């Protein structure tokens, strides 16, 4: 009646719950976008699409992000987050494109491209190891200037001579910038593209600090090459498409991925990234009982914060930020993203038997350079090799890790036990300034992976490939 209408119109409107809710709908949209490319656009029959998505992991991923956002998002001005988790083959096991699909269908894990910050540094260090350096190579952490660009560490703190392993763990910007100048920005880009980064990357000096934009999906999948022992892990979500009558229209074939890194280099990179979680900027990501490796990333003015890392079972990337690019309140990659990463990974690994990461978290170095040439891309493998060899999470079978080779015994083990009773940094031992093998830095213990001001805002400067200038310390240490 007229009276009922007036009464209803006088009441405040109520929002009905959206039918299309749940993070799995981000994946459903992704599948719909891919189908025309896989089977053509002339689709008339009902289809059955099999995917790699694990709904249990999907729910855990969505909960991990929303729990952190609900607790600290408003306080720290972080309104959005995304997560991607892949296995050793690149299969997408969980993907969350935002905090609420019903509110926003924009997929921040796939479509959005953001600067990765220091989460890009593993590609820099991989290029350096391929050039012949090792995790024990020494570089001077001190103020430097490359052209008109002067990269700085967080709060302008410097440690002097440090190993590359320490530089990775403490996310030292000056060392990463030096390495780009030595190996060349073009070589770093080649490594990133070889591992799976498909976005255009700018060949300038600041690439050392991750100033070129990438998607979380491609970044996470590129990290999976470290997790699986050096094979490309091209991300995929559709495994099979059939008609209602059973006719197969598409079948994924990921049985023989190319090798993209030398196994020795993978083992050393994994050892250095294990240090990030053991005693570096990613301490908040420690998973009780599991060995893990990864890298934090924070961009200019705290606009983006990321943590990407892996166990022997999964590789997961997490991003926090705002759609409008506004700054968060000092949120670093080792903060909210590392916490959400940890929460998800603990839930995802529940009930699985711990297994070490590839290489066991130990440095392989007999005082001689590790392999300098590009890996042999023709060496075949199978999806079964990858799953049985590097994806733990089942039976605790011993991996044929590189340090078991008699000719390549590591000279120095990294911290492999990351299980701690309390994640408070004060529980870690203090620096021993007289012990050169002590991984704990005296001045940069609490550093964050923050790039200096104006990174990427100055005119691009192409790094010049030039050899490292040996110092007396280099000669003494045999560098």
Where are these regions (language model features)?
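A generic secondary-structure signal for well-formed alpha-helical elements
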Residues: 1, 39, 127, 131-135, ...
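Non-catalytic, structured segments within soluble enzyme domains
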Residues: 1-59, 63, 96, 179, ...
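Soluble, non-transmembrane domains of envelope/secretory-pathway proteins that act on or interact
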Residues: 14, 147, 254, 292-479
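Conserved catalytic neighborhood of penicillin-recognizing serine enzymes
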Residues: 17-21, 33, 133-188, 232, ...
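A penicillin-recognizing enzyme superfamily signal
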Residues: 51-74, 83-85, 95, 100-106, ...
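Active-site rim segments in enzyme catalytic domains, especially the processed small/beta chain
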Residues: 107, 111-146, 150, 279, ...
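Mid-domain, small-residue-enriched loop/turn segments at the edges of structured enzyme/sensor domains
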Residues: 150-153, 184-221, 230, 234-237
């Amino acid at each position: 009646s007229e009276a009922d209408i007036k009464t209803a119109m006088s009441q405040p409107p109520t929002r009905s719950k959206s039918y299309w809710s749940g993070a799995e709908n981000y994946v459903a949209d992704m599948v719909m976008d891919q189908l025309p490319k896989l089977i053509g656009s002339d689709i008339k029959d009902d289809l059955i699409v099999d995917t790699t998505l694990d709904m249990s992991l999907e729910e855990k991923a969505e909960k991990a992000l929303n729990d952190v956002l609900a607790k600290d998002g408003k306080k720290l001005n972080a309104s959005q987050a995304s997560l991607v988790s892949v296995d050793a083959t690149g299969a997408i096991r969980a993907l969350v494109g935002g905090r609420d699909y019903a509110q926003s269908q924009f997929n921040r894990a796939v479509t959005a491209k953001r600067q990765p910050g220091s989460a890009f540094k593993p590609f820099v260090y991989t290029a350096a190891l391929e050039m012949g350096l090792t995790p024990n190579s020494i570089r001077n952490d001190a103020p430097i200037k490359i052209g008109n660009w002067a990269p700085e560490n967080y709060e302008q703190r410097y440690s002097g001579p440090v190993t590359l392993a320490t530089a990775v763990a403490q996310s030292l910007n000056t060392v990463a910038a030096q390495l780009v100048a030595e190996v060349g920005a073009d070589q770093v880009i080649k490594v990133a593209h070889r591992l799976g980064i498909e976005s255009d990357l700018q060949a300038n000096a600041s690439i050392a600090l991750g100033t070129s934009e990438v998607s979380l999906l491609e970044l996470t999948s590129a990290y999976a090459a470290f997790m699986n022992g050096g094979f490309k892990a091209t991300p995929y979500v559709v495994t099979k498409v059939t008609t209602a009558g059973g006719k197969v229209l598409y079948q994924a074939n990921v049985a023989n991925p190319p090798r993209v890194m030398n196994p020795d280099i993978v083992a050393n990179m994994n050892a250095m990234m294990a240090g990030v979680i053991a005693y570096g900027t990613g301490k908040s990501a420690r998973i009780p009982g599991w060995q893990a490796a990864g890298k934090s990333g924070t961009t200019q003015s705290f606009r983006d914060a990321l943590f990407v890392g892996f166990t022997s079972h999964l590789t997961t990337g997490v991003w926090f930020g705002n759609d409008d690019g506004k700054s968060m309140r000092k949120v670093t990659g080792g903060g909210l993203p590392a916490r959400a990463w940890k929460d998800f990974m603990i839930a995802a690994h529940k009930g699985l038997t711990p297994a070490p990461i590839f290489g066991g978290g130990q440095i392989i170095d007999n005082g001689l350079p590790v392999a300098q040439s590009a890996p042999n891309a023709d060496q075949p493998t199978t999806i079964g090799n990858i799953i049985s060899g590097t994806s733990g999470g089942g039976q605790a079978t011993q991996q044929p890790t590189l340090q078991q080779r008699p000719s390549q015994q590591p000279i120095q083990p990294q911290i492999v036990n990351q299980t701690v009773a309390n994640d408070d940094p004060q529980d870690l031992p203090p620096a021993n300034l007289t012990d050169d093998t002590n991984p704990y830095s005296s001045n940069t213990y609490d550093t964050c992976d923050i790039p200096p001001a104006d990174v990427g805002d100055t005119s691009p400067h192409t790094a010049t490939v030039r050899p490292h200038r040996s110092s007396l310390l280099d000669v003494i240490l045999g560098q």
